[in-house]
Amino acid sequence: MDSDTLSGLLENVAKKFPDRRALSVSGKFNLTHARLHDLIERAASRLVSDAGIKPGDVVALTFPNTVEFVIMFLAVIRARATAAPLNAAYTAEEFEFYLSDSDSKLLLTSKEGNAPAQEAASKLKISHVTATLLDAGSDLVLSVADSDSVVDSATELVNHPDDGALFLHTSGTTSRPKGVPLTQLNLASSVKNIKAVYKLTESDSTVIVLPLFHVHGLLAGLLSSLGAGAAVTLPAAGRFSATTFWPDMKKYNATWYTAVPTIHQIILDRHASHPETEYPKLRFIRSCSASLAPVILSRLEEAFGAPVLEAYAMTEATHLMSSNPLPEEGPHKPGSVGKPVGQEMAILNEKGEIQEPNNKGEVCIRGPNVTKGYKNNPEANKAGFEFGWFHTGDIGYFDTDGYLHLVGRIKELINRGGEKISPIEVDAVLLTHPDVSQGVAFGVPDEKYGEEINCAVIPREGTTVTEEDIKAFCKKNLAAFKVPKRVFITDNLPKTASGKIQRRIVAQHFLEKP
């Protein structure tokens, strides 16, 4: 099968490493690459023959991080259909929007089901099928009757690079999520890029900490590992737990993990309050999906003895765009998201002209991993694909070593009386305060300056900080116009389902408070 498709890459891995561990559910069972491939092939056949799935159909999936999700996700793609993973915590109204916007033809869930998703599917007259795998030697049970169709094998299905494979919605800074269709080629290209930059091989092993309905956990954690012949462990609870994370990492001989900064901070807090007697020797730790403050990077390296590689990614790029290299390939720079990986990247001004090093502009990309455009959104496509490049909406610059530095989202830069303030810079200062665990800066409307800067912080466990403490600290470390006018002390920051802190949502949350 074509290695320009994800399905082809995984078939090649199953032939090359049939007996190596591919997927484990912690404390329950293990699947080899050959066994996983067999389960995927059988499930793909059932989707075609018994569920009536045709090439190009969209199939929605809503599961915790389970083996059934992995099998059914890959079976949908193998059946030449498009997988649309959805957050199991959505309301019925949200499910209705996403199922409708994606034109889903089928809803897949665990045997326990998902009442809001099923309610929405029923309203839209979308069929519902459950999937269950009791143990490693069992057949996958689908809640759809066996047909007498002669199509009993997926071997007749030929996957093509331009087949639709994945449909996701952006969580971006705009209020209306945009639908992002991605192809087999997009997925295969991204998996190859991730494998290459981190030198993933069949000897690697990781534990999934991020939800698999999000592109970060799905591509960087799961698919790149499977595509390298490596091993993936899913937590027994189907989601991240700070309590079981290190025991799982040790039990399954993990060599690396990838997470968002908020998860890294939770892991650090756990290390401070309940340290392990020893930690596994990791090749690297990866951080992506939001800016990692240099102070957090250094704390992670000090605590766990592994290089922390910050990367830069977007749904529209099928995740990875740039990354800091492994130590043997060059320095990793705190505060930088590294060098482009497997694609062209340029800094453009508003006229579409490429900028020289150290000059700021919009980060733009093009390559085989990049979506061809948003679904049914000509306005977003016109703005997003100018001058022959995809426009990320991020402001950044290359240094003279070719490393990318991000300043912030175009829409998140705070314009205080004409002074442009990067909230990322303020975040970094907040996180150097010894008593601050998490912190985020954001812009708010202001009659005098147009916009003013505010921030919210979570104190470290067992400490107390005041608004005056934070302001005084910021005055020592920032120019006067960058010091937050108001500081919210809190024990919780609103996050997206993937653990990202979005400034727009944080600003709304705290502005609603008196």
UniProtKB/Swiss-Prot annotation:
Alphabetically ordered keywords of this record: Acetylation, ATP-binding, Cytoplasm, Ligase, Magnesium, Nucleotide-binding, Plant defense
GO cellular component: apoplast; chloroplast; chloroplast stroma; cytoplasm; cytosol; plasmodesma
Reactions it catalyzes: oxalate + ATP + CoA = oxalyl-CoA + AMP + diphosphate
Positions of ATP binding: 170-174, 214, 289-291, 310-311, 315, 394, 409, 500
Class of this enzyme: ligase
Domain of life: Eukaryota
Residues modified as N-acetylmethionine: 1
Needed cofactors: Mg(2+)
Localization of this protein: Cytoplasm
Residues binding CoA, per UniProt: 239, 418
Function: Oxalyl-CoA synthetase acting exclusively against oxalate. Follows a two-step reaction mechanism, wherein oxalate first undergoes adenylation by ATP, followed by a thioesterification in the presence of CoA to yield oxalyl-CoA. No activity with malonate, succinate, malate, acetate, formate, lactate, glycolate, glyoxylate or glutarate. Required for oxalate degradation, normal seed development and defense against oxalate-producing fungal pathogens.
Domain remark in the UniProt entry: Both substrate-binding domains (SBD1 and SBD2) are involved in the substrate recognition, and are sufficient to confer the substrate specificity.
Family under the similarity heading: Belongs to the ATP-dependent AMP-binding enzyme family.
Record's protein name: Oxalate--CoA ligase
